[in-house]
Structures are given as structure tokens and as C-alpha cells.
């Protein structure tokens, strides 16, 4: 081939000033260069070095995989690699959807459950103090008026429910009912989220005793021994008169209020719920009555506050079962009634009942009336204790709380009497939904006691925190925790005691990362909200589905249909 000279190359160059192919009228549209195309044409770049080759990353796949994964993506508008598509900052081509649809379906059920307990919880005293007539807790009667903790709709088609899909993890799956019906004439004053409550702090002293009532039996140490598998201890029904009277109906608190002993009055059950509120999940409510410069923390009759919850803090908490389902005994309301029944009978069973060996308090039981009660009183000591919640000396604020002790025991070393609180954890079915990954107590309680307790701390954080707070403010030396399981996981009317473990309350609180200073700060904050407002009645409500507390101002006659909270008002009218 003859060589080409430089002059020939220069002469072959186009003579126009512009570079590139010459523009003709056939390739222009209104004078603008235009290339006709259809949306079915394959469009791409001259050289795209960022795309994968036809052989794939690992050299395998071949032409068929190339056509399926690469070539067809270049169709106009077909994928993210189109020239006309918006290029995102992050590549989402590798995103995949994982279905979280569950096979089992749950539907809403009609409320029902275990028939336990002797009548209603709470009660009211005589209008002028004294013993009056009080309703008892525990026993065998029916418990009425209990609101279900979890009242979700159906899940998955059987009752009009819907299937779960993408991002359902981010949607509320359990819509619980509020513990009290919010009426239109209630005025919301404050809304506090739990994050704000967790930052509160108030240091206070250990408190001082004002007076004590009742008596205590000695604790039966044989329950501390590990039972033989062939001879497990059965949980027996022990009928004893026990009371859970609200604050304003307590004749002793009425007398202390008339003497201006304190600004705030409460019971240990109500106070512990308020102090441990950031750990709560289920709904609850506290009635707050401001009378003059005094604040009474009360509860309603049949309130969920008195029920012992089960696995409230578990990641997969117990759910409602369908009507007629075999899992109906494992729904939240039935488990709560079962746990309340177990705690009442367990505390009575572990006592050595002997009139010659018991510790008498300074005064008799203020709620027991031998002329009306057929059952003997339960081993119970009521200590009225006073705490200083003042921020400075110029503005003193004190709190009087009625605390409870369950038993007394001799110290193994010094031989001195130690005061005990007795509670019970219950196992329903380690394999059922809502068990929270709990271990089998029958096989693991002895060999892996630490793991069993750690799991209970996780699944029942609020319940254990409340028991610990009640033990500390009562100045109990030891908190006994019994481990009670069903004799048959499918039946909730027979139980066995698998063991009892004792802790010092403050040591147990440190293991749970429980701060009493935070609890006292919450109490002082809520009380200050009521003290800065006018006299009247307020209700503190835990939102059933959100970690929020709401303070409502309610009419003065609210809840009086239930026969409660009118004791103070009647006393004031008589004084006038």
C-alpha cells in the first residue's frame, strides 16, 4: 500500500469550522440536530466501564445471564441504568424484600378467663375513719370489671384482619384499650414522654417510721430447699383476709392528714407504679386528688394497677387468642388474673402460722373486723413511713406512704428478726407464644439459675422493679421470690412451687439498673404539676400504645359512681 502524505490527509479534512459530521437538513428538526428513535430502541453509552460484563463478576453466567440481567435494562425507561433515569446517591439495585408474614392467624376473642380472687380489690373506709367495711382481695370468688390489657383486632383474614407485608415492623400491631375511658369533659393539662421522665432525679433519705399495724408470721425456710422432682410442692388455696385499700379510704392516712403530717399521701402499690412508670408498657391510671395543700394518690376499684402482669416487657409479649382457642388461658388478661391468684396464695402458704410465734406490731390490723370476717387475717404488717422530698428548707414537702411486709425470719448469723416481702413469678408455658424465650424452669432453675433470673428481669422489668421499690421503701431486709409453674402447661388451675430465692432489695435494684432517685424525681414532678393548679381531681393516664403519660383535670364527681374517692369530700363537708 502506497504511503499517504501529510498533505493528502490535510486536504481530506472538512473545510467547515465545526468539528464532526456535516449537518444536513435531513438530520435537523427546525434547525436543531435530531436523531429519530423509538422507546423500544436499545440505548446505552459508548463505553460504560462501571457496568458488569457479560460474564458477570466471577466469570460465570454466559450470554443468557447477560441478556437477562444487563442488556434488557438498557431499554428506555426499563431500569435504573437508563440514561434518562435519576441517578440515586445509593445503589438500590441489590435491595430485596423479605416477607415477615406469619403462618398462624390470631383473631380477637371474647373477654373471659380464670375465675379467681375473692371479690373486688380496693374498698373504702368509714367516712370518719375507724375500721369500717373493706373489701378483700384474693380467695376464690370471681374478679369482675377487669379490662383486658391487649385488645388487638384479628390478624390475617379470619376476622377481617390483614396480612403483614413490607415495613409492617414499623407499624403498631397491638392497639390496646386505655385503662379508663377518656370523657369529652376531661381537660388535658400535661403530656410527658418517658424520655423526659428518665432524666429526672431527686435524692432523698431512707425515710422514718410513723406507726405500724398488723402482725407477721415466721417464714417457712423449707421452701428455700430445692424440692424433689417426684415430690413437688403443690400451690394450695389458703383463704386469708387480705386487703388493698386505696389511699383516701385508709383510716390511718385520714388521721395523719388531719394532723398535717405530710403533703403527699399514697400506698406502696400506687407509688411504685409511678416511680417505675418509664418501664411500663400496659395502660394504667392514677387518680390524684388535691385537697387544700395536700395531694392524695388514689386508685380506682377494679383498676389494672392491682393486677400482676406477666411478660409485660417481653419482645413478643402475650397476645389475645381467638374465641374458643386452646391458647385463651395464655392471653394477657387471663395470665394477669392467674398471676394475681398465685401471688395471693403463695404468700399465705409459705408462712408458719402459730399464735405463739408471731411478731405483733404496735397496733392491730386497721382493716380487719372479726365480727364480719369468717376467715382469719393474713400475715401482713402495714408500716406508715415518711419521706422528705423537699428541694430546700424554705419549702418542705413530705410524703407518707403505707408500706406492706409479708413475713419475718431469723437471721442465720445474728439470730435477729428480718422483715421479708414475699412475691411469686409464674411460668405458664415455655414453648407458647409470649413466653419471651424463657428457659424451662423445671430443668434449668437449679443448673442455670442466673440465666432464668436474667430472662425474668428482661421480660418482667416493670413488675420486678415495682416489687423492688415496694421492698426498699418498706425497709425490708430480704425480698423472697417464688418460682411457681403450672402442673400442666395446658391447665391454669393447678400449680407447683419449684423453688424460692431471696435477695437484698438494694442489691436486686442494682442488678436491674433501677434508680430510686429517678423514681422520687418523677413523684415530685407529678405532684408539683398538681400543686401549681387549683384544687380538684386529676387523673394521670398511661397511653395504651405509646410511652407517654397524660395528666387530665376531671370533674369533681368523677368515679363517685363506683363509690370511691368521696371520703375526703364528705369529711370536708362535715367540717364546714
Swiss-Prot record:
Any single Pfam family the record assigns to this protein: eIF-3_zeta
Protein origin, superkingdom: Eukaryota
Renumbered residue ranges of the record's region RNA gate: 304-318
Disordered: region residues: 103-176
Record GO terms (molecular function): mRNA cap binding; translation initiation factor activity
Gene Ontology CC entries for this record: cytosol; eukaryotic 43S preinitiation complex; eukaryotic 48S preinitiation complex; eukaryotic translation initiation factor 3 complex, eIF3e; eukaryotic translation initiation factor 3 complex, eIF3m
Segments of skewed composition (Gly residues): 110-122
Keywords attached to this entry: Cytoplasm, Initiation factor, Protein biosynthesis, RNA-binding
A GO BP annotation: formation of cytoplasmic translation initiation complex
InterPro entries: eIF3d
Biased composition (Basic and acidic residues): 165-176
Cellular location(s): Cytoplasm
Function: mRNA cap-binding component of the eukaryotic translation initiation factor 3 (eIF-3) complex, which is involved in protein synthesis of a specialized repertoire of mRNAs and, together with other initiation factors, stimulates binding of mRNA and methionyl-tRNAi to the 40S ribosome. The eIF-3 complex specifically targets and initiates translation of a subset of mRNAs involved in cell proliferation. In the eIF-3 complex, eif3d specifically recognizes and binds the 7-methylguanosine cap of a subset of mRNAs.
Protein family per UniProt: Belongs to the eIF-3 subunit D family.
Self-association and partners: Component of the eukaryotic translation initiation factor 3 (eIF-3) complex.
Domain-related comment: The RNA gate region regulates mRNA cap recognition to prevent promiscuous mRNA-binding before assembly of eif3d into the full eukaryotic translation initiation factor 3 (eIF-3) complex.
The protein's name in its UniProt record: Eukaryotic translation initiation factor 3 subunit D
Organism: Botryotinia fuckeliana (strain B05.10)
Amino acid at each position: 500500500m502506497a504511503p499517504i502524505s501529510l498533505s493528502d490527509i490535510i486536504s481530506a479534512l472538512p473545510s467547515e469550522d465545526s468539528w464532526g459530521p456535516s449537518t444536513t437538513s435531513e438530520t435537523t428538526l427546525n434547525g436543531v440536530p435530531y436523531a429519530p428513535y423509538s422507546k423500544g430502541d436499545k440505548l446505552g453509552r459508548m463505553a460504560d466501564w462501571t457496568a458488569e460484563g457479560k460474564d458477570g463478576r466471577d466469570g460465570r453466567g454466559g450470554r443468557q445471564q447477560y441478556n437477562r440481567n444487563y442488556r434488557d435494562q438498557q431499554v428506555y425507561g426499563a431500569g435504573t441504568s437508563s440514561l434518562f433515569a435519576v441517578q440515586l446517591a445509593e445503589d438500590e439495585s441489590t435491595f430485596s424484600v423479605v416477607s415477615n408474614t406469619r403462618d398462624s392467624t390470631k383473631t380477637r376473642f371474647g373477654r373471659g378467663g380464670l375465675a379467681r380472687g375473692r371479690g373486688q380489690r380496693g374498698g373504702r373506709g368509714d367516712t370518719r375513719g375507724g375500721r369500717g367495711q373493706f373489701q378483700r382481695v384474693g380467695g376464690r370468688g370471681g374478679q369482675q370489671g377487669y379490662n383486658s390489657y391487649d385488645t388487638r383486632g384479628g390478624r390475617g383474614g379470619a376476622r377481617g384482619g390483614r396480612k403483614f407485608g413490607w415495613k409492617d415492623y414499623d407499624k403498631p400491631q397491638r392497639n390496646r384499650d386505655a385503662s379508663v375511658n377518656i370523657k369529652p369533659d376531661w381537660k388535658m393539662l400535661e403530656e410527658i414522654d418517658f424520655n423526659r421522665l428518665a432524666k429526672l432525679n431527686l435524692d432523698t433519705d431512707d425515710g422514718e417510721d410513723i406507726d405500724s399495724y398488723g402482725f407477721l408470721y415466721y417464714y417457712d425456710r423449707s421452701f428455700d430447699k430445692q424440692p424433689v422432682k417426684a415430690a413437688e410442692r403443690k400451690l394450695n388455696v389458703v383463704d386469708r383476709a387480705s386487703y388493698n385499700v386505696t389511699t383516701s379510704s385508709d383510716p390511718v392516712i385520714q388521721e395523719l392528714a388531719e394532723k398535717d403530717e405530710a403533703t403527699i399521701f399514697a400506698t406502696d402499690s400506687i407509688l411504685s407504679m409511678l416511680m417505675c412508670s418509664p418501664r411500663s408498657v400496659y395502660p394504667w391510671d392514677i387518680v390524684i386528688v388535691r385537697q387544700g395543700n395536700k395531694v392524695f394518690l388514689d386508685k380506682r376499684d377494679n383498676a389494672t394497677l392491682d393486677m400482676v402482669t406477666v411478660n409485660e416487657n417481653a419482645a413478643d409479649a402475650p397476645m389475645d387468642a381467638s374465641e374458643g382457642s386452646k391458647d385463651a388461658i395464655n392471653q394477657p388478661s387471663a395470665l394477669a388474673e392467674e398471676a394475681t391468684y398465685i401471688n395471693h396464695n403463695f404468700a399465705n402458704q409459705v408462712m408458719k402460722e402459730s399464735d405463739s410465734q408471731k411478731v405483733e406490731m404496735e397496733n392491730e390490723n386497721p382493716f380487719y373486723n372479726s365480727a364480719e370476717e369468717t376467715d382469719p387475717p393474713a400475715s401482713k404488717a402495714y408500716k406508715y413511713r415518711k419521706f422528705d422530698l423537699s428541694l430546700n428548707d424554705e419549702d418542705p414537702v413530705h410524703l407518707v406512704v403505707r408500706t406492706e411486709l409479708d413475713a419475718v425470719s431469723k437471721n442465720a448469723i445474728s439470730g435477729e428478726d428480718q422483715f421479708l416481702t414475699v412475691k411469686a413469678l409464674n411460668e405458664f408455658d415455655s414453648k407458647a407464644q409470649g413466653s419471651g424465650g424463657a428457659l424451662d424452669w423445671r430443668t434449668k432453675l437449679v443448673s442455670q439459675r442466673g440465666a432464668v433470673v436474667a430472662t425474668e428481669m428482661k421480660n418482667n422489668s416493670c413488675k420486678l422493679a415495682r416489687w423492688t421499690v415496694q421492698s426498699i421503701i418498706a425497709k425490708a431486709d430480704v425480698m423472697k421470690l417464688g418460682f411457681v409453674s403450672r402442673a400442666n402447661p395446658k391447665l391454669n388451675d393447678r400449680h407447683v412451687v419449684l423453688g424460692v430465692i431471696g435477695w437484698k432489695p438494694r442489691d436486686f435494684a442494682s442488678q436491674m439498673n433501677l434508680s430510686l432517685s429517678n423514681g422520687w424525681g418523677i413523684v415530685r414532678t407529678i405532684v408539683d404539676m398538681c400543686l401549681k393548679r387549683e384544687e380538684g381531681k386529676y387523673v394521670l393516664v398511661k397511653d395504651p400504645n405509646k410511652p407517654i403519660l397524660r395528666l387530665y383535670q376531671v370533674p369533681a364527681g368523677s368515679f363517685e359512681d363506683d363509690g370511691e374517692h368521696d371520703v375526703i369530700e364528705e369529711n370536708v363537708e362535715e367540717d364546714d
